[in-house]
C-alpha cells in the first residue's frame, strides 16, 4: 500500500495499510474519522487512503469530497449526493470539516452507519429507499474538532489521530515542495518557525521559491534566511505579532484575566482561546491558572531576546 507522498505519520500509515489490505481482499473498509489540528494533512491522508480503495472489478473506486459547511439539509444530502452517487454505485464519500454536519444529516448517518453482520443498511426518505452496501460504499470523515461531532456517530467510526510532526518531518516537507538547494544551517532555522504544521511547511517552500526567483538564485543559504525572514517579518519560533503582543500584556502583571486580555487586544474571548493561546501554551510561554493568565519564565526570556 502506497503512502509515499505522505511524510511522517508512520504509525498511521501502517494502520491504514492494514485496512487497505483487508479491503482489497474483502471489499470492506471501516468508516474512518481523521482527527488533527488545522494544516496537519488529514484531508490529504484521507484522500490518499480513498484513492487506493477498490471496486468489485478491482479498479480504483470513485471518491467525492463534501465540505460539510455546504451541506444545508437532509434533503440535499439525499437528493444531491445519495441518489446520484450512492444508489447502485460504488463510491467513497469524504466528509471534510465533519464537525459542521447538520443535525438532521447526522441523525441519518446514525441509521446508515449502524453496525451489523450484514454490513449493509437501508435508509428511507420521502418514499425513496437507498441501500448502503459497505462492500460498495465507504464513509470517511475529517475534522479538527472531534468533540463537536455527536458521540454516537464517533462510536460508529474508527478514529485516526494524526501524530505530531517532528522538525525533521517538516524539513523534509519543505525540501519535497521546492527544487531549491537549501543549506543545512538555513533549514535548521526554517524548521524552528513552522509551528509544527505541515501546511506551513508547504507554504514556506513556496515562499522560498519566490524569494530565490526574485534574486535569480538556486541556493538558499544562511545569509538568504536572514534577509528572507526580515522581508517577511518572521519572528522567532514563528510567533505572530498578536501572540507577541499578548506576551507583552501578560508581562505587565502577575495575572491577567481573559476579559482584560480581550479588551487590550480587541479580540473576542473565543478567538483568544481558539487562535492564540494554544500555541503559546504549547511552547510554555504562558500559563492559564484558575484566576487568570500569566507569562512564564520562558515567555519573559523570549521577550528579552527580541530587544
Which stretches of residues belong to each language-model region?
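Dynamic helix-loop-helix/coil hinge segments at AAA+ ATPase domain boundaries and subdomain interfaces
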Residues: 1-15, 235-237
Amino acid at each position: 500500500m502506497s503512502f509515499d507522498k505522505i511524510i511522517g505519520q508512520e504509525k498511521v500509515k501502517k494502520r491504514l495499510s492494514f485496512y487497505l489490505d483487508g479491503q482489497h481482499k474483502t471489499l470492506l473498509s471501516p468508516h474512518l474519522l481523521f482527527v488533527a489540528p488545522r494544516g496537519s494533512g488529514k484531508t490529504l491522508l484521507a484522500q490518499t487512503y480513498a484513492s487506493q480503495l477498490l471496486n468489485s472489478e478491482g479498479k480504483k473506486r470513485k471518491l467525492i469530497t463534501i465540505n460539510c459547511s455546504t451541506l444545508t439539509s437532509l434533503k440535499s444530502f439525499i437528493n444531491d449526493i445519495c441518489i446520484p452517487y450512492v444508489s447502485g454505485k460504488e463510491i467513497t464519500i469524504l466528509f471534510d470539516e465533519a464537525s459542521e454536519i447538520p443535525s438532521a444529516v447526522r441523525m441519518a448517518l446514525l441509521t446508515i452507519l449502524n453496525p451489523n453482520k450484514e454490513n449493509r443498511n437501508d435508509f428511507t426518505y420521502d418514499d425513496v429507499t437507498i441501500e448502503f452496501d459497505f462492500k460498495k460504499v465507504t464513509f470517511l470523515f475529517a475534522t479538527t474538532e472531534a468533540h463537536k461531532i455527536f458521540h454516537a456517530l464517533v462510536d460508529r467510526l474508527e478514529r485516526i489521530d494524526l501524530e505530531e510532526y517532528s522538525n525533521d518531518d517538516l524539513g523534509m516537507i519543505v525540501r519535497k515542495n521546492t527544487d531549491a538547494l537549501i543549506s543545512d544551517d538555513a533549514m535548521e532555522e526554517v524548521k524552528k518557525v513552522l509551528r509544527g504544521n505541515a501546511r506551513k511547511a508547504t507554504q514556506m517552500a513556496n515562499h522560498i521559491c519566490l524569494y530565490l526567483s526574485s534574486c535569480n538564485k538556486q541556493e538558499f543559504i544562511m545569509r538568504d534566511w536572514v534577509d528572507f525572514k526580515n522581508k517577511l517579518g518572521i519572528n522567532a519560533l514563528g510567533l505572530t505579532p498578536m501572540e507577541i503582543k499578548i506576551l507583552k500584556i501578560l508581562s505587565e502583571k502577575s495575572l491577567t484575566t481573559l476579559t482584560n486580555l480581550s479588551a487590550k487586544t480587541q479580540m473576542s474571548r473565543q478567538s483568544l482561546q481558539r487562535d492564540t493561546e494554544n500555541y503559546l501554551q504549547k511552547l510554555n510561554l504562558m500559563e492559564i491558572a484558575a484566576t487568570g493568565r500569566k507569562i512564564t519564565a520562558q515567555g519573559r526570556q523570549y521577550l528579552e531576546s527580541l530587544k
